[in-house]
């Protein structure tokens, strides 16, 4: 990284970031390999062993150097002169190189900013992604209205590149990036379809994540600027990491650019109790006040996306609901605020009267229907939730079959221990338990009852329900830990964010 820093310091002295030559350096792709991002694309063909192949990278760089291979050929659609004959393999290597190179200047900006004393002092105000959980616990019980917003994708990837051009001044680098995306994503179309973006994001996760995070960071910077300016109380400034990428110079830039444009509209948005939470492509906007101000923010988001980022968003896709009547989905959970009503008898002198007390409680519920749908898709049960056998696993040993089912149960228990009601989680465990028994019975060509009677596997299969309690009994003191407390309390594990299949809200 010191070599990159010296290189970029020379570029800054010329008021420009020259990233283009770095694309043709072999150590860039070695850096991508060492960071373990999409490691499988650098493997040799079958028979050469699982070793990093510099030969493929050298051949690719040679083709990129040649002048005739950088000419866009509209007539030859089957053969790609830029990516060669192995389009998928080469495109993944190039995307890794682009992602590494474009992250370097921003990483150095972030490192230099963290070395400053004022930024280090503000560490206590840095908001982590894990702060979502205490936020849901502490704040949502005092809020009344919530808006569930799906952040729209840009209609064309050119928008993402244009946003990035404001911060990186290197025309040759962006010409090469456009050329790569033109061949891979069919930029000759007027509108990039969602299917094409999805395919590109799966094949080039790091590059797409960087471009998409930059787009989200841009609009959130404007939103946070307005949010801080529109509060009745002066908020203490803080810095936010938006999924690894945040640039501190943006704050001063926003004050200069947007202060004049929004100086007359800020009184319309004054709401000190508005809260904003985002994870991946979904955000939650919640407020304590009347829905009128929520509608103002809703139209603000729509106009910001349409006018500033050229992203089309329908107003009907953003709904404003009461927390006590509707639930919202975030991080794989269904959440709402439940009203608990209780009556208290009070006596004053000779008069006795009842006082009704209404308290709020946050309910975080396991999404049972989507989970059953996922289990049915994986052939553990039918669409009604009735367990079925898994014949594909019948060739494995009994121990391996039981261990596979237990691993799934562990992951589900680990993820959904933050739920306030465990009944749905136990139902999922019950489906997996019976599916495991039926799979073992199918392997031994026997009925479920005869298999259990012959093998005595009932005690072994009880691990589906007892293993989590045993683990927690080792964490908490035995005198304070009880089974009733385990059923009642929520336990958040901070590593659940790595379970992408469960976190994904789509």
Curated annotation (Swiss-Prot):
Q: Which UniProt keywords apply?
A: Chloroplast, mRNA processing, Plastid, RNA-binding, tRNA processing
Q: What cellular component terms from Gene Ontology apply here?
A: chloroplast
Report if keyword Lipid biosynthesis is assigned. Answer: no
The coiled-coil regions, if any, are none
For this entry, list what GO says about its biological process.
mRNA processing; RNA splicing; tRNA processing
Q: Is tRNA processing one of the keywords UniProt gives this record?
A: yes
Q: What Gene Ontology terms describe what this protein does at the molecular function level?
A: RNA binding
Its biological function? Usually encoded in the trnK tRNA gene intron. Probably assists in splicing its own and other chloroplast group II introns.
Q: What is this protein called?
A: Maturase K
As recorded in Swiss-Prot or TrEMBL, the protein's gene is named: matK
């Amino acid at each position: 990284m010191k070599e990159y820093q010296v290189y970029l310091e020379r570029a800054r002295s010329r008021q420009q970031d020259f990233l283009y030559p770095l694309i043709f350096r072999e150590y860039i792709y070695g850096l991508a390999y060492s960071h373990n991002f999409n490691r499988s694309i650098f493997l040799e063909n079958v028979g050469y062993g699982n070793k990093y192949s510099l030969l493929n990278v050298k051949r690719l760089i040679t083709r990129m150097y040649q002048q005739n291979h950088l000419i866009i050929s509209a007539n030859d659609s089957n053969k790609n002169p830029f990516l060669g004959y192995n389009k998928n393999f080469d495109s993944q290597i190039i995307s890794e190189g682009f992602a590494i190179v474009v992250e370097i200047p921003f990483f150095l900006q972030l490192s230099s900013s963290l070395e400053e004393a004022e930024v280090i002092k503000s560490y206590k105000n840095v908001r982590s992604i894990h702060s979502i959980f205490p936020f849901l616990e502490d704040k949502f019980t005092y809020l009344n209205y919530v808006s569930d917003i799906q952040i729209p994708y840009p209609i064309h990837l050119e928008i993402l590149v244009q946003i990035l051009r404001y911060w990186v001044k290197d025309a040759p680098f962006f010409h090469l990036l456009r050329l790569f995306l033109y061949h891979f994503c069919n930029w000759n179309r007027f509108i990039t379809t969602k299917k094409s973006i999805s395919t590109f994001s799966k094949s080039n996760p790091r590059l797409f994540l960087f471009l998409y995070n930059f787009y989200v960071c841009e609009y959130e910077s404007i939103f946070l600027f307005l949010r801080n300016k529109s509060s009745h109380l002066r908020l203490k400034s803080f810095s936010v990491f938006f999924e690894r990428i945040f640039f501190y110079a943006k704050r001063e830039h926003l004050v200069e650019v947007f202060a004049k444009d929004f100086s007359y509209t800020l009184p319309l948005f004054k709401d000190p109790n508005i809260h904003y939470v985002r994870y991946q492509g979904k955000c939650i906007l919640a407020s304590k006040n009347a829905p009128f101000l929520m509608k103002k923010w809703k139209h603000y988001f729509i106009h910001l996306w349409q006018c500033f980022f050229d992203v089309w968003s329908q107003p009907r896709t953003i709904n404003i609901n009461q927390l006590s009547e509707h639930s919202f989905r975030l991080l794989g959970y269904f959440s709402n605020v439940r009203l608990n009503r209780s009556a208290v008898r009070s006596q004053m002198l000779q008069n006795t009267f009842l006082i009704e007390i209404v308290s709020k409680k946050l309910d975080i519920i396991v999404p049972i229907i989507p989970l059953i749908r996922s289990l049915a898709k994986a052939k553990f049960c039918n669409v009604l939730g009735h367990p079925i056998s898994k014949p594909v696993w019948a060739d494995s040993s009994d121990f391996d079959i039981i261990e596979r089912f237990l691993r799934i149960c562990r992951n589900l228990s680990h993820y959904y221990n933050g739920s306030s009601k465990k009944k749905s989680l136990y139902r999922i465990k019950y489906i997996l338990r019976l599916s495991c028994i039926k799979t073992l019975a199918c392997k031994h060509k026997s009925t479920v009852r005869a298999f259990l009677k012959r093998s005595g596997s009932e005690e072994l299969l009880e691990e589906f329900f007892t293993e989590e309690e045993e683990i927690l009994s080792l964490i908490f003191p035995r005198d304070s830990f009880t089974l009733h407390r385990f059923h009642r309390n929520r336990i958040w594990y901070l590593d659940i964010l790595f379970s992408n299949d469960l976190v994904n809200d789509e």
